[in-house]
Curated annotation (Swiss-Prot):
GO biological process, alphabetically ordered: rRNA base methylation
Disulfide bonds: none
Natural source organism: Bacillus subtilis (strain 168)
Protein name: Uncharacterized protein YbxB
Listed Pfam families: MTS
Keywords in alphabetical order: Methyltransferase, Transferase
Length: 201
């Protein structure tokens, strides 16, 4: 089987790189590595999701599903210091990098842990917002499972924020979300990427 960034234990040889990137008007230092998604820069889709995200009206934590080396969760943790940001990824190397990046950016209001989808998320835990740049290459079944589990783990009036390219299935993603959520809207479109917000009322 060929290896992907959504593999649990990447076997590709480690080749760490450290670089700086500006997100939400703040400078961050990230260390990335082989075997994680978009290792040389914060990818356009994640940047668009980070820039588009608005703090939820409801109180509570925020969950970053498929956190990679951490740009989404850490940039939001830096902005919303009174909230705890949970960051999960199936990829053990990604989880290690996220922890390293939290430390080198002085971010403490995070809980970062390995989880295959929501397998290690407390079944009773609910969040004010969940964000994901879903692993499209893992297949529609996995992406839809993220949507389904997100619906279960959101508070009342909580929101799921997603970035997905039109060519990678944004229209079918919207259809699936409309089955699960009360309000679904496209809040941003840019260069073929959609930012979709799905809300539980």
């Amino acid at each position: 089987m060929s290896e992907h960034y959504y593999s649990e234990k990447p076997s590709v040889k480690s080749n760490k790189q450290t670089w700086s990137f500006r997100l939400r008007n703040k400078d961050f230092t990230f260390t990335s590595d082989s075997g994680v998604f978009s290792k040389k820069e914060v990818d356009f889709g994640s940047r668009l999701l980070i820039d588009s995200f608005e703090e939820p009206e409801v109180e509570g934590g925020i969950l970053d599903v498929g956190c990679g080396y951490g740009p989404i969760g850490l940039s939001l943790a830096s902005d919303f210091k009174d909230r705890t940001i949970h960051m999960i990824d199936v990829n053990e190397r990604a989880v290690e990098l996220s922890n390293e990046n939290a430390e080198q950016n002085g971010i403490t209001n995070v809980k970062i842990y390995q989880s295959d989808l929501f397998s290690n998320v407390d079944s009773a835990q609910t969040f004010a917002s969940i964000l994901t740049n879903p692993p499209i290459r893992a297949g529609k079944k996995v992406v839809h499972a993220i949507f389904e589990k997100s619906a279960e783990h959101l508070k009342a009036s909580g929101e799921l924020w997603i970035v997905i390219q039109k060519k990678q299935g944004a229209p079918s993603a919207i259809e699936k979300l409309e089955e699960l959520f009360d309000e679904v809207s496209v809040v941003q479109k840019k260069k073929g990427y959609y930012i979709i917000k799905a809300k539980k009322v």
